[in-house]
């Protein structure tokens, strides 16, 4: 199949963000072309999925293929953190499990699913340059190294899912902002014969802190375990002056009794050890005229809570719904891009707050690693958000994780967010962002204490009956941003909250009197 000279929608990148957005838009009847630099399957880190991806797997129609592949099921999380042990499980949620995956296999399933849904997929294609009409990208220069072919493809909409390479953010917008917090380095390898700790849940990811970092253990389906060490970049550089990467890795593992004496006892390390920087960043511009940055192209957050694929697939859903409604004339370009920008910023900030709060549990150890992870007031400037939007993030983040542990409907969610707003701003005036941040963290610490004390209602994340995160933005009427939110039924797109409110009012109004019986004509 020849790469076309033009397409309605061009998606750059075939990872979960690109394949999700492409599939959703192709199913709406649009011409979608996806180009990917690599040839799939290709290796990628980020193997532990959150439950929040499960509804999107269903939405994509990929459930059967994912289940049939036999990925290791993940029904919880085991933490040894700050000298304490916590076990999270999801027994009472709509989806009580998710997966640990080999990303080369999972990502290919999603990409082939995109092809089945009508997406034109081209692998081994490198995009070297974009052409613009004003601020709007309209064409891409491409080449295929395996054949020497090259050309130009024109498009109306660009979804940049190019990952950390960040086609738009790094080459044209130059808008990528790195956070001072979470500037870490990950080193990992794969072990045969590792032991999953014996706990009450199946296949948990195991996370353990050490004095100067933390370790993950992700069980994969072929009796292999991914085990990684995360330390601050400055310490990594310091150690590299006298130690090899392998020595740094093994020294870190030995600092954790959980991994040294339980998980890796009797296990064998495969030869290759990999290293990658985990610098967290977000683009100041995430959408604009005719373009959207999705997944890692727009933002990347510290891997502590395994949020990478979650952010990729959720941002893809937000972007696909926005593009569909623009094309259909349901929402204007400016409103849709503002909606996407604010939603993705909000999703990212919530994860940053939660990660910072977990790191702060260990801050009392007063090592450079733990103090370096703290999200300070000036750090929040990276998000380029209004104080009102930031306050909404704090309120809904805290209410979703803590205050509404038993929430099962949108009404309770809304009331919970209102209660937290009152808590954060109980004197009726705008507070300092630092104070809001600290109060949000305080509530998370209270939540962690509940988990530690085995409160039966406590869980790592709470989901509504529909399976969506309780603290998501833009994914239901109660999370509307700028009056807009995503709908997938009966068709994908953006709805205005006011429309739904009017519909509800009409439903609640007294029914009109029945008309008199018709009189038959004779």
UniProtKB/Swiss-Prot annotation:
Q: State the signal peptide span.
A: none
Q: Does the keyword Nucleotide-binding apply?
A: yes
Residues reported in the UniProt entry to bind FAD: 17, 36, 42, 44-45, 48, 103, 127, 296, 309
Where is chloride annotated to bind? 307-308
Q: Which Gene3D superfamilies match?
A: 3.30.9.100, FAD/NAD(P)-binding domain (3.50.50.60)
Domain of life, per the record? Bacteria
**MF term (GO), any:** nucleotide binding
Has UniProt tagged this entry with the keyword Nucleotide-binding? yes
GO BP annotations, alphabetical order: toxin biosynthetic process
Q: What else is known?
A: Chondramides are secondary metabolites with antifungal and cytotoxic activity. They are non-ribosomally produced depsipeptides consisting of a polyketide chain and 3 amino acids (alanine, N-methyltryptophan and beta-tyrosine or alpha-methoxy-beta-tyrosine).
PANTHER family in the cross-refs: FAD-BINDING DOMAIN-CONTAINING PROTEIN (PTHR43747:SF5), FAD-BINDING PROTEIN (PTHR43747)
Its annotated function is as follows:
Involved in the incorporation of a chlorinated tryptophan residue into halogenated forms of the secondary metabolites called chondramides.
Name the record gives this protein: Tryptophan 2-halogenase
Q: Give the organism the record lists.
A: Chondromyces crocatus
Name of the coding gene: cmdE
């Amino acid at each position: 199949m020849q790469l076309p000279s033009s397409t309605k929608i061009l998606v750059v990148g075939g990872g979960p963000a690109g394949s999700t957005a492409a599939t959703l838009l192709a199913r709406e009847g649009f011409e979608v072309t996806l180009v990917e630099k690599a040839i799939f399957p290709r290796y990628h880190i980020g193997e532990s999925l959150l439950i929040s991806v499960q509804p999107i797997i269903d939405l994509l129609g990929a459930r059967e293929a994912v289940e049939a592949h036999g990925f290791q099921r993940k029904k919880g999380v085991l933490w040894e953190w700050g000298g304490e042990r916590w076990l999270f499980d999801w027994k009472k949620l709509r989806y009580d499990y998710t997966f640990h995956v080999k990303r080369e296999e999972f990502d290919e399933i999603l990409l082939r699913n995109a092809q089945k849904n009508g997406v034109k997929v081209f692998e081994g294609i490198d995009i070297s340059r974009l052409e613009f009409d004003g601020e709007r990208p309209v064409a891409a220069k491409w080449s295929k190294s395996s054949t020497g072919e090259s050309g130009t493809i024109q498009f109306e909409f660009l979804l940049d899912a190019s990952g950390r390479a960040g086609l738009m953010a790094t080459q044209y917008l130059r808008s990528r902002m790195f956070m001072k917090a979470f500037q870490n380095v990950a080193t990992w390898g794969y072990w045969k014969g590792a032991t999953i700790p014996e706990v009450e849940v199946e296949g948990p990811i195991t996370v353990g802190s050490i004095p100067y970092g933390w370790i993950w253990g992700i069980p994969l389906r072929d009796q292999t375990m991914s085990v990684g060490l995360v330390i601050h970049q400055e310490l990594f550089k310091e150690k590299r002056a006298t130690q090899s990467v392998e020595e740094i890795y093994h020294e870190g593992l030995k600092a954790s009794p959980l991994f040294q004496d339980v998980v890796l006892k009797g296990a064998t390390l495969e030869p290759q050890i990999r290293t990658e920087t985990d610098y967290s960043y977000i683009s100041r511009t995430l959408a604009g005229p005719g373009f959207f940055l999705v997944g890692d192209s727009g933002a990347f957050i510290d891997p502590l809570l395994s949020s990478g694929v979650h952010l990729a697939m959720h941002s893809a859903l937000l972007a696909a719904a926005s593009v569909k409604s623009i094309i259909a004339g349901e929402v204007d370009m400016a409103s849709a891009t503002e909606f996407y920008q604010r939603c993705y910023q909000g999703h990212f900030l919530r994860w940053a707050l939660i990660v910072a709060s977990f790191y702060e549990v260990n801050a009392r150890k007063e090592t450079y690693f733990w103090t370096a992870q703290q999200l300070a007031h000036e750090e929040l400037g990276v998000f380029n958000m209004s104080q009102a939007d930031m306050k909404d993030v704090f309120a809904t983040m805290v209410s979703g994780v803590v205050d509404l542990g038993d929430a099962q409907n949108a009404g309770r969610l809304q009331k919970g967010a209102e209660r937290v707003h009152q808590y954060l701003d109980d004197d009726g005036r705008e507070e300092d962002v630092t104070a809001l941040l600290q109060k949000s963290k305080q509530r998370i610490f209270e939540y962690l204490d509940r988990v530690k004390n085995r409160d039966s209602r406590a869980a790592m994340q709470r989901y509504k009956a529909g399976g969506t995160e309780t603290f998501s933005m833009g994914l239901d009427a109660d999370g509307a941003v700028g009056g807009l939110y995503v709908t997938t039924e009966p068709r994908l797109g953006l709805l205005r909250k006011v429309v739904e409110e009017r519909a509800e009012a009409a439903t609640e109004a007294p029914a009109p009197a029945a008309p008199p019986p018709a009189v038959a004509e004779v």
